[in-house]
Amino acid sequence: MNKQVVYFSNSGNNKRLAQRIADYNGLSAIPIIPTNTYPSNYHELTSRARQERFHHIDVQIHPVKLAKNTDTLILVSPIWYADLPRPVITFLKQLQRPYQRIIFVSDKFMLGFGFCRRTLRKYVPSSTNIEMIAATSNDFSTIISILKNS
């Protein structure tokens, strides 16, 4: 299977995790970058993320180039307010074709995946197999076991 790693990370935790996954697979990790960067101040960041989430604000992102022969998309992202961050939703809306499999990986897993599966399902075809992995860059064993089976 041809894999591609795409990630969104504001603090750097999910970036490190995505790079580790990409290195394991001999790939590069492609970032999802909002055109309007998020503030580094925690209060300002959470205020903006909360407003985007609950008002369903579309967040513009820089173009993400994906290989045409990819059948497995490994999407690494935090979970903000029990759902995917709005830049990730913009990315999903811009996908040009279906994927056989999407593996969603999140670092800083605390309360579960919330609405993430529902949101992924909303933007990808029903034929796409969605897998969810809670992991950290320090404990890579769960990710390795899933990736070995792909």
Model-found features: residue ranges?
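Redox-cofactor binding/interface segments in oxidoreductases and associated redox assembly factors
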Residues: L75-V76, F104
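Short beta-alpha junction loops
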Residues: S106-G112
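A short helix->loop->beta-strand "cap" motif at the edges of active sites that frequently abuts
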Residues: R97-R101, S126
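Short, aromatic/basic amphipathic alpha-helical patches
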Residues: F115-S126
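N-terminal beta1-alpha1-beta2 submodule of the flavodoxin-like/Rossmannoid cofactor-binding fold
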Residues: M1-L75, A82-I89, K93, S126, ...
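Short glycine-rich anion-binding loops that position phosphate/pyrophosphate groups of nucleotides
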Residues: P78-Y81, F109
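Glycine-rich phosphate/pyrophosphate-binding loop and the adjoining helix
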Residues: T128-S150
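Short, charged, surface-exposed secondary-structure boundary motifs
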Residues: T37-H43, G114-F115, D139-T142
